Amino acid sequence: MNGIPTPTVDIQWASDAPDAPDETHLCEWVRHAAIAAGGVVGDITLRIVDEEEIRTLNRDYRDKDAPTNVLSFPFEMPEGLPEGAMDPLVGDIIICAAVVRREANEQHKPLVAHWAHMVTHGVLHLLGYDHIDDDDAIVMETLEIRALGELGFPDPYSPAQQESQAQPENTELNP
């Protein structure tokens, strides 16, 4: 992909998610988000979970006792290991299929577009981007909008997108 390094992606299905995108799309979106951020070498795990698992993780790691859409856990090298002692690990992205589905319905967004957004959002968090303050949010959202646009998806932050039920071109879940 234009010489920009992309991660290896491992998909874990810890929950039934019959309306989730297939692994080909999920991997494509992870890699595309990594390219939008300048590229990354290493392994990324994308785990699809139920509300109970994501609620537990959100409670244990963020002190928020509620399910959420996506969590990202960057890999931290254990102390004492020499540089290069392990294959490069980027980290884990956890997505709750039920929350993504519910949010897409509530926000009147095509489900596939919301999935692509959550995958992209999770990758950018994994790579160190956040939206805690306004300046950081602008940087992160700009990357998300650009990456999703290149994939044929509309701006997820546009009020028009939240009112649209139109399916973007080239984005069927199972072509």
Swiss-Prot record:
Residues making up the signal peptide according to the UniProt record: none
Keywords: Cytoplasm, Endonuclease, Hydrolase, Metal-binding, Nuclease, Ribosome biogenesis, rRNA processing, Zinc
InterPro entries per record: MetalPrtase_cat_dom_sf_prd, YbeY, YbeY_CS
Major localization class: cytoplasm
Cofactor(s) essential for the protein: Zn(2+)
Region: Disordered, residue numbers: 154-175
GO biological process assignments: rRNA processing
Residues binding Zn(2+), per UniProt: H121, H125, H131
GO cellular component labels: cytoplasm
Entry-linked PROSITE patterns: UPF0054
EC number: 3.1.-.-
Cofactor binding note from Swiss-Prot or TrEMBL: Binds 1 zinc ion.
Compartments, record wording: Cytoplasm
Family per similarity comment: Belongs to the endoribonuclease YbeY family.
Protein's name in the database: Endoribonuclease YbeY
Gene responsible for this protein: ybeY
